[in-house]
Amino acid sequence: MKELLPVGCVIMASGASRRFGSNKLLADFCGEPMLCRAFAATDTPRLSARIVVTRSDEVAQLCRSRNVPVLLHDLPGRNDTVRLGLSALLKQVPELFGCMFLPGDQPLLCRKTVEAMAGISGRDHGARRERQKETEREIFRLGFRVRNDPSPLTGSPVLFEKGLFQELLTLPQGMGGSVLFRKYPAHVHTVYIADRNELADADTPEALAQLEALARQKL
């Protein structure tokens, strides 16, 4: 069996929910707060560590009630969320090889998908130890192939290997990790899924209701 390198996950929960009208992460989804779906998707031994990063006291309370590590902050930018989350994971797992950034508002994202993404980056093939550090700068994002369309749908979660950690810790104010997509296009890879709804986020009450209906069909 090949050794799996350590991968962590930052659950992004610092958004303002402006389009939703209230904190969407706490909205009911199949009988529990929507954020609990992200807890379930990341509840896997394939992840060496995980942490929720939020500006919401209520979200922090929910995390603590479910024994999910949480970091509460009051900083404004997406770059702050990335830096705080990655820094916290590196304190827990200094040898971290990859870091996944997962939004808390994609309730149909499933655990198998998270495990697949973590596994693709974290495989320690024998040759990997002999490769140059440049090959530890890969980026993996989730995607769905659209029939008769050469351009796939792409989205989150996104996983960055450790060669990019320093740049993630020093992103421009207000910017997220997507700036590295443009900087290193040859290093961006897509992990394809069969269900496009895993990419869907619940930005409005109407979108939440549609996704909940889809989830109930699978029960």
Listing of model-derived features with the role each one plays in the protein:
Residues K2-D57:
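N-terminal glycine-rich phosphate-binding loop and ensuing alpha1 helix
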Residues K2-L5, C9, Q166, T170-L219:
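Conserved alpha/beta core of the MobA/IspD/sugar-nucleotide pyrophosphorylase nucleotidyltransferase superfamily
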Residues M12-S14, V53, L102-P103, G143-R145, ...:
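Short beta-strand segments
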Residues D28, L108, V158-L159, T190, ...:
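Short aromatic/basic micro-patch
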Residues F29, L71-H73, L142, V191, ...:
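Hydrophobic residues at beta-strand termini and immediately following loops
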Residues S48-L84:
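Short, surface-exposed acidic-centric catalytic microdomains
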Residues L75-L169:
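Conserved beta-loop-beta/alpha segment of the NTase-like Rossmann-fold superfamily
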